[in-house]
């Protein structure tokens, strides 16, 4: 996203709140949100600051050594040559300001957007300002998708929905000759390449007890051969190349055989019910004009699974935001690992992916949801029944 757009949207957000500005800081890659905002710049070796006031022009504070690295941004730039001139200039920038936002989360509550070190926090506070978390500014200014970004996600989502079905058919076609988990993962990655999609660190293809590990990664050494009677979980994610392309991320489950065992069906039904309860709560909130916070949706899904008797086996958050990274910087649907009070606002996308992981097998169902101005829009194919894999596809 162009820096001018980020600045304009950040100022739009801050003018409606009691915020004097947003102060971004980085040293040697400590704060990736700084670089998400200004764009990639290589070989910056000294501390750098970006001040975005609620009103007025932004200002960079960078080292004399690094000045040419930032020249293309066209932002007013102040240079420092040593520690004293850096702190003096920073004090001047913050003079008369009251409450400012930084990448800080009280008690580390939201690690995803807690990026400044304690010493820097102390330094800025010593200049007479009150520091509040920038999490909501980040979400509003950097995480809402434009039409091009949504289009890229929809393409990835469509291909993911197609390729996961192809993978299940490929397993069926390969049962007689034998196929391992990692070989199914290779098949999926090859299909990504054929469709012009990027290959990252996945997918997860997990059989039976391997599916009890939410992030199982198949390798030639740990993979098992898939056979009749097995339970198969596939979690796959990808996007188009390019800085403006957004991820899709889905998880499906299948059984190799004609009749799904009762226990597997029971757990599957609990997961599907949990997912649908969270989606229904999101849709209801929108119809009623209530903007939900991330933690609230997690509670809805978790309560459903607790009621089904499997609360002890759902030990991760309900979902995460999507963006240029598969786990992005907008709200997570989480009351478990954190307590995410950010709002689920139009323009962002999230996953709904409850899971139950008992020792013998695990079940997770993951869909993607884009929050449009007209309400939640499910962008991926929705699994309703266990896929049955049969020999010969």
Annotate each language-model stretch with its function.
Residues 1-393:
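Active-site neighborhoods and metal-handling regions in enzymes and metal-associated proteins
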């Amino acid at each position: 996203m162009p820096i001018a757009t980020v600045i304009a949207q950040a100022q739009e957000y801050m003018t409606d709140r009691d915020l004097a500005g947003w102060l971004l800081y980085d040293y040697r890659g400590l704060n990736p949100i700084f670089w998400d905002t200004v764009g990639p710049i290589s070989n910056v070796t000294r501390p750098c600051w970006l001040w975005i006031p609620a009103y007025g022009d932004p200002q960079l504070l960078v080292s004399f050594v690094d000045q040419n690295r930032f020249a293309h941004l066209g932002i007013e730039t102040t240079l420092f040559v040593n520690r004293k001139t850096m702190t003096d200039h920073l004090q001047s920038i913050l003079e008369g300001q009251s409450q400012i936002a930084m990448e800080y989360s009280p008690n580390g509550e939201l690690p995803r957007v807690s990026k400044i070190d304690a010493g820097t926090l102390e330094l800025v506070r010593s200049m007479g300002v009150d520091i509040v978390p920038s999490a909501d500014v980040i979400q509003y200014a950097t995480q809402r998708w434009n039409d091009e970004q949504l289009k890229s996600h929809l393409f990835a989502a469509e291909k993911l929905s197609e390729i996961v079905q192809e993978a299940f058919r490929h397993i069926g076609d390969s049962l007689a000759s034998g196929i391992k988990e990692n070989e199914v993962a290779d098949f999926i990655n090859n299909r990504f390449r054929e469709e012009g999609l990027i290959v990252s660190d996945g997918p997860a293809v997990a059989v039976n007890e391997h599916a009890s590990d939410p992030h199982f990664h198949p390798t030639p050494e740990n993979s098992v051969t898939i056979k009749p009677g097995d339970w198969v979980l596939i979690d796959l994610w990808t996007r188009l190349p390019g800085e403006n392309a957004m991820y899709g991320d889905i998880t499906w489950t299948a059984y190799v055989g004609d009749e799904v065992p009762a226990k597997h069906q029971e757990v599957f039904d609990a997961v599907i019910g949990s997912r649908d309860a969270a989606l229904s709560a999101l849709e209801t909130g929108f119809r009623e004009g209530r903007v939900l916070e991330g933690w609230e949706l997690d509670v809805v899904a978790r309560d459903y699974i607790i009621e089904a008797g499997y609360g002890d086996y759902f030990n991760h958050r309900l979902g995460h935001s999507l963006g240029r990274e598969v786990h992005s910087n907008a709200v997570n649907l989480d009351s478990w690992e954190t307590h995410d009070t950010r709002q689920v606002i139009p323009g962002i996308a999230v996953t709904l992916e409850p899971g139950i992981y008992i020792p013998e097998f695990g079940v997770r169902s993951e869909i993607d949801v884009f929050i449009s101005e007209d309400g939640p829009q499910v962008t991926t194919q929705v699994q309703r029944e266990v896929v049955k894999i049969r020999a010969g596809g």
